[in-house]
């Protein structure tokens, strides 16, 4: 009996000892874990101190782009609706490249629509290469007073979806933009509208009007790209330049589809600084007209960075549409005689796009055509001189808008009809 009680007490002592050891071990592990966590946080804090904000990578995505867009458009007075309009996946068996994808990624076009008076004509605005619809921020309020303004980001740009770019020819690349725009039109149930395109957006707008003239009431091409081919131009200088080592390198980069956006992405944390230097110089110190305010410059820079740094998609069209030197592979000049839509060309006086291309096109066109040059404006005439630009647009559309304002029927002083 005594031996039994002794054995029982011995087992109890062993269990108590194990429990104490286990508790001590658990506490030790917990303490070690807490210490490790504290050390990690301290290391992160020291890293943040040692690694300045200027060297930290700034993330981007479609959500960041839309947020930057909303901040930029917050300075406007006219209410608007922003939506991502689904354009589907195309008809079964479609041979159009932009319909094809190995993923189930949705296709949508980022769209902003501004409030307008009942019965106002619809004006659809299409941005140029390397831009997005927010670039028209200085124009929306004024134009929305006379039009139902709708601005879009083309497929693969801005806040629109960015599918993998699989085009391998000029025809496929044109279809990427023209046919996706047509699917957007169907989704929006638009039958007739005035179509305005800037730069590369002008090229797309003109090609769309050639294919679907029944939907376009009037075509407005602002500093439009794509009128001249290398063979049409006095390109002796380009031939000589290509023969130099610099020309050979740049031509190789072009044919390799090296885009400005790739440079912004490749610079990582230095990318925003590069964009800031560009917007500050182009729309500030070196502005052709009215420079941006400090607030406008800050908001536009943030917006431009996010649109450029996002996934590469539509930007990869460059080498398929243009050859080195920005000469069109399928120039609009060659199809000018086929145009069925009345057209107005608008150029800044200092636009690097040569308005003589429009002059030559007009000689072959069988529809009404006007060419307007706006003073104090460069390639981004709608930012440089918004008042002059608005006058040119209203004059171009004088037959579609109400006649209650006589100044819409004439150009402001300084604007020139060519």
From Swiss-Prot:
Role played: Lysophosphatidic acid acyltransferase which functions in phosphatidic acid biosynthesis. Is highly specific for lysophosphatidic acid and able to use different acyl-CoA donors. May regulate neutral lipid accumulation and participate in the regulation of lipid turnover in vegetative cells. Possesses additional triacylglycerol lipase and phospholipase A2 activities in vitro. Is not active as esterase or lysophospholipase.
Protein name: 1-acylglycerol-3-phosphate O-acyltransferase
Species classification: Eukaryota, Viridiplantae, Streptophyta, Embryophyta, Tracheophyta
UniProt remark on domains: The HXXXXD motif is essential for acyltransferase activity and may constitute the binding site for the phosphate moiety of the glycerol-3-phosphate.
Motif (GXSXG): 197-201
SUPFAM superfamilies on file: alpha/beta-Hydrolases
One of the record's GO cellular component terms: cytoplasm
Renumbered ranges of motif HXXXXD motif: 379-384
Phenotype upon gene inactivation: Accumulation of neutral lipid droplets with marked increase in absolute triacylglycerol levels in leaf mesophyll cells.
Gene Ontology terms: biological process: cellular response to hypoxia; fatty acid homeostasis; lipid homeostasis; phospholipid biosynthetic process; phospholipid homeostasis; triglyceride homeostasis
Family statement: Belongs to the peptidase S33 family. ABHD4/ABHD5 subfamily.
Entry-linked InterPro entries: AB_hydrolase_1, AB_hydrolase_fold
Top-level enzyme category: transferase
Assigned keywords, A-Z: Acyltransferase, Cytoplasm, Lipid biosynthesis, Lipid metabolism, Phospholipid biosynthesis, Phospholipid metabolism, Transferase
Location in the cell: Cytoplasm
Record-linked Gene3D superfamilies: alpha/beta hydrolase
Chief localisation class: cytoplasm
Catalysed transformations (reactions): a 1-acyl-sn-glycero-3-phosphate + an acyl-CoA = a 1,2-diacyl-sn-glycero-3-phosphate + CoA
Domain AB hydrolase-1: 121-251
EC number: 2.3.1.51
Gene Ontology molecular function terms on file: 1-acylglycerol-3-phosphate O-acyltransferase activity; lipase activity; lysophosphatidic acid acyltransferase activity; phospholipase A2 activity
